[in-house]
Amino acid sequence: MNHMVIASRGSRLSLRQDEIVSESLKKNGVTTEVTVIRTRGDLDSTHALKDIGGSGLFIREIEQVLADREADIAVHSAKDLPYDLREGLVTGAVMPAADSADLLVIRNREIRVIGTGSARREAEIRRLYPEAEIRGLRGNIETRLRKLEDGAYDAIVIAEAGIDRLGVDLSPFQVKKLTPEEMVPACGQGIIAVECRADATEVREQLKAVNDEETMRRFLPERYLFGLLRADCSMPVGAHAVVDGDRITLYALYMDKKSRISGSCSDYRELCRTLADRVM
């Protein structure tokens, strides 16, 4: 196959991620085109994700297009993937990861009101800033920063990966990069995942050629841990891995509990099970 149709969300960040995948495939002689799909999460941009609830808010409609063979691959922010992909679909590749950290972007030195629409971020912010008021915040990166600039919030929490990929200038603000100890990232944060049909042999071979093995070494443990936690957007859950050579450190957040564990990469499944037992 020398041409692929990509199913994707239509945000500026999503389209930039499509470009990254397309550029990688092009080096292997594959051309692409994008079909934009509006997901349930896109259609409701008012309510907090934790209030909409459910699993795969930004994924399921795209997976349907893939399953119906109207597209060859789907490009996602891996943090949006539910722990259970649709039957018959697999993650065929991941692209080189961007930074996985969350950023606290600050307008006012005296932080009284912090904006986020994520249950995970809200839970962690309440630990870090117990006196602050947490207010809901939705929208794309530009919308969220505009609301911050307009004075609706003193600070907001945003993923560094999106800022980096879009080249957004944060110089008007003070920026605090949060460590995994301060805020456990979402599973797959900073990773672009490419989904395809399990029976699409040729597509899977072409994706294997562009897969980033180093990122996959982080992606697989995070996905395994996330699957053990079995959570959705309505729950404060984080699953993060830091790989250093043959060593791995795993971080987990589940509701009001968090913990970490380190060991050999080859033992990541056992480490994940131990960590999940600690926090659940």
Regions found by a protein language model. Name each.
Residues 58, 76, 157-159:
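Short beta-strand and adjacent tight-turn residues that come in two discontinuous sequence segments
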Residues 78-79, 85-135:
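A conserved helix-loop-strand patch within extracytoplasmic ligand-binding domains
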Residues 78-81, 161-163:
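Short glycine-rich anion-binding loops that position phosphate/pyrophosphate groups of nucleotides
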Residues 47-73:
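Short, structured active-site "lid" loops
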Residues 1-38, 43-44, 49-51, 122, ...:
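Small-molecule-sensing regulatory modules
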Residues 71-75, 154-155:
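Short, Asp-centered acidic motifs that coordinate Mg2+ and/or phosphate
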